Amino acid sequence: MLKFMADNPQVQQRLRTALREAWPAALAEQRIPTVNEIHGTVIPFLDATVEESLRCAGTLPNTVRDAIRDTTLLGHFVPKGTTVFLTLYGPGILVPPFPETIADDTEKVADWDPEDMHVFKPERWLVPSSTAPGGLEFSVNAGPSMPFSLGLRSCFGKRMAYYQLRTVLALVVWRFVLEKCPEELSTSQAVDGVTHRPKHSYVKLSTAY
C-alpha cells in the first residue's frame, strides 16, 4: 500500500488533499486526526485507495472451495464434489481479461476498461452519486475484486483488516510524504505463504508539514 503511494505521487497528493479537507480542525491545530475522526468521516478516495491497493497487491495467492453442485465456470463443466482452486491474485489485473462471451450474465459487479486493469487507479472505485459530497461515492462493487474471498467462509478478519488499513494509510499520508526508493529496494517481488507478502518493505519518508 505504501509502495503504491511512493510510485504514484499524484494519487498520494490527491489523497492527502482529501484528508486535509475532511479534517480541517486537525490541520489547523497541526495534529494527527483522532481515531474517531478517521472512522467517523466518509472519505471516498481514502476507501478507494485502500481497495485499489488490495486489488493490485493481493492478500492471498489463492483459496480453495468444493463444488456443492454441478456447474459451469468460464465455459468449463465442474461436477459436484470437485475441489476448485481459485486464484485471487491475477484475474483482477489480467490483460487481456477472460473473454466476455464466457462470463456469467448474472454478474453483480460493474466492469472496467481492460486496457488499464494493470494500472494503480483508485478512482475506478468511485461511482456517481447525487447525494455524496463532490458527486462521487465509494462502491466496493464497482468492479471485480475479492481480496478476502466471499460468502460464509470469507476471511473472518476482514473488518479488522479494513479498519487497520484505513487507519495506517490515513495517518502515514497525513504526516509524511512517501518518496520512491531505489529500484533495487522497490520491486514488486513477493513471497507467497499464508498471505501474499512483499519481498522488499522499505520506505523513504519526508515530513508533509
PLM region spans:
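Hydrophobic, well-ordered secondary-structure elements that form the walls
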Residues: 53, 78-81, 120, 151, ...
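Cytochrome P450 I-helix active-site segment
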Residues: 7-59, 74, 80-82
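A structural signal for well-ordered alpha-helical segments within the folded catalytic domains
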Residues: 44-51, 142-146, 163-170
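Active-site-adjacent bridging/hinge elements
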Residues: 133-147
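Conserved cytochrome P450 K-helix/beta-meander segment immediately N-terminal to the heme-binding cysteine loop
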Residues: 87-135
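Short, small-residue alpha-helix embedded
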Residues: 1-6, 168
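C-terminal helix/juxtamembrane-tail motif
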Residues: 196-209
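Cytochrome P450 heme-binding "Cys pocket" and the immediately downstream C-terminal segment
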Residues: 9-13, 150-154, 158-196
